[in-house]
Design a protein with these regions (language model features):
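Short beta-strand and adjoining strand-loop segment in the mid-core
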Residues: 35-39, 75-77, 189, 193-194
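Short, active-site-adjacent cap segments at secondary-structure transitions
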Residues: 1, 76-79, 108-111, 125
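Single conserved hydrophobic/aromatic residue that forms the stacking wall/gate
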Residues: 197-201, 205-211
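A general structural motif
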Residues: 15, 50, 98-110, 167-174
Length: 211
């Protein structure tokens, strides 16, 4: 990413590019930005992330007037750290540019509260990898292990396999394997693990639209 940023340069007004990844939720999906490009961020960088994420969500994913939320530890005024509190004040001062919902907490991530979640790259990467690990533990280790313990549960699984497979497909991290680097004068898509080998139609369509 560093070499790509140097070669392609950042857009005017953008100091640091950010990784935007699409994640599933109760209804549809949301954009998480930054997902790991910059572990630390200044308040103005979070504002840039909000604008970039909102534009990506609207013009690439087709979400009309996307709601933008700032990840913090509480929705009350002053509940976050110095950076998020300052970023919150800045985001509230630019009405009309983005549809700013306000601060959100971790338990709201996968609810239909906002369409874009803004954070620094350290927080975003922890969220992303925790969600991926939880998917594996839930379906392969926890649920799969419990089903195998009892023949009655195995029979029940056969009747509910359609719903089980649909949820597993929706939550599978490989469906969301490509993360565009936003804020540069060009196209860079970051992928990890086997995500490019198993890249799905939603990700491919996102790549085409972004390009």
């Amino acid at each position: 990413m560093a070499s790509g940023t140097i070669r392609l340069r950042t857009m005017e007004g953008i100091e640091r590019p950010a990784l935007a990844t699409v994640m599933p939720r109760q209804e549809g999906h949301f954009v998480l930005i930054d997902a790991g490009a910059n572990p630390s961020a200044k308040p103005e960088h979070l504002v840039h992330n909000a604008v970039l994420g909102s534009a990506y969500c609207q013009h690439v994913l087709g979400t009309e007037n996307p709601r933008v939320g700032l990840m913090t530890i509480g929705t009350e005024e002053g509940k976050g750290n110095e950076t998020t509190n300052a970023a919150n004040d800045l985001l509230k001062s630019i009405p009309g540019i983005i549809n700013y919902h306000g601060p959100i907490e971790g338990f709201q991530l996968f609810e239909n509260v906002v369409d874009v979640v803004v954070c620094d790259g350290f927080t975003g990467n922890v969220i992303l990898k925790t969600a991926e690990s939880l998917f594996k533990c839930l379906f392969k280790d926890f649920l799969g292990g419990e089903i195998k313990k009892n023949p009655v549960r195995q029979l029940g699984y056969l009747f509910s396999k359609g719903a089980y497979d649909a949820i597993r497909t929706q939550l599978n991290p490989e469906r969301y394997g490509g993360a565009p680097l936003l804020g540069i004068k060009g196209n860079i898509l970051k992928a990890h693990g086997l995500s490019l080998i198993h890249i799905s139609e939603p990700t491919r369509l996102g790549m085409i639209s972004y390009a």
